[in-house]
Amino acid sequence: MRGQWSLLLGPARLCLRLLLLLGYRRRCPPLLRGLVQRWRYGKVCLRSLLYNSFGGSDTAVDAAFEPIYWLVDNVIRWCGVVFVVLVIVLTSSIVAIAYLCVLPLILQTYSVPRLCWHFFYSHWNLILIVFHYYQAITTPPGYPPQGRNDMTTVSICKKCINPKPARTHHCSICNRCVLKMDHHCPWLNNCVGHYNHRYFFSFCFFMTLGCVYCSYGSWDLFREAYAAIEKMKQLDKNKLQAVANQTYHQTPPPTFSFRERVTHKSLVYLWFLCSSVALALGALTIWHAVLISRGETSIERHINKKERQRLQAKGRVFRNHYNYGCLDNWKVFLGVDTGRHWLTRVLLPSSHLPHGNGMSWDPPPWVTAHSASVMAV
């Protein structure tokens, strides 16, 4: 491919040089001489406006894409409200279908113990989904305090021109530095940081559980509803053919009532929506679970990957200072100090604060000695 380009560019460069040489001659046509002069004048103006001895190709690319970055940041900022409303509407529609369509059907077929189990599990799951989503939206992710000189500073933010503690990154959408920033989530219209990271992951986890529960539990109802919809289509087709043939003396085929049609279509909608969300959100939840097990955020994964490659080229081994071990990483992330906290802080709604203040990252006192030794690099 490079050889083909060289074959094409060679004659083009030769023709350009000939035109430039002809432009300096007096016998050259005035039109050609004027075009050459304008070309050179344009090059001088362009270089005088854009030349920077400290810049390079990366700087030029960043400057060229800056309008696109600005457009994306502002679009995501305004679309966040739309995404939040969409999540609320879709979740409310599933809950409404479960009460109005699914519940009357299972009351006729399920036994009392089975009904009790579904009643308690579904409402427990729904409460956790609503609680964690509300907390993830309304809880600020955490920002570095302004005007403090006693905090541990790692670097200076190039956007805010303020001290930036460890694991702090600048969000171009919120236009602020965020403590332990993971990413900006448009579905929350909020940054995921130190103080709401647990709420975000818990919402993803329990929403995935709820979608799997609805999809698996409504499989039989979905099959019956889908078959009924196909039958409705066939009956409507036969009815249209009968009207076209003007067979008024024949008895019209039986049709489904409006309530039955709405119920069947709602069950199909429920199954497809829950199944698709379970697959997409389940993959995202697994991805974040892997990152939490490694003691890193989405941004730190890219940083650690580059640092790992840099040290590997020098024959050295990279160690993550914030990796205390898989189990201890989860304890720190979920705020679990005792065995009782797995129930009161994980399986039940809890608004407890995470460990630390998001600026200094000393290991908790209950972290094992092995984890502490891993930190010391």
Swiss-Prot record:
Record membrane topology: Multi-pass membrane protein
GO MF assignments: palmitoyltransferase activity; protein-cysteine S-palmitoyltransferase activity
Reactions the enzyme catalyzes: L-cysteinyl-[protein] + hexadecanoyl-CoA = S-hexadecanoyl-L-cysteinyl-[protein] + CoA
Any one GO BP annotation for this protein: DNA damage response
Keywords: Acyltransferase, Apoptosis, DNA damage, Endoplasmic reticulum, Membrane, Transferase, Transmembrane, Transmembrane helix
E.C. number: 2.3.1.225
Pfam families: DHHC (PF01529)
PROSITE patterns noted in UniProt: DHHC
Cytoplasmic side: 1-79, 138-198, 288-377
Ranges of residues in domain DHHC: 155-205
Written domain comment of the UniProt record: The DHHC domain is required for palmitoyltransferase activity.
UniProt record similarity statement: Belongs to the DHHC palmitoyltransferase family.
Name of the protein: Palmitoyltransferase ZDHHC16
Organism: Bos taurus (Bovine)
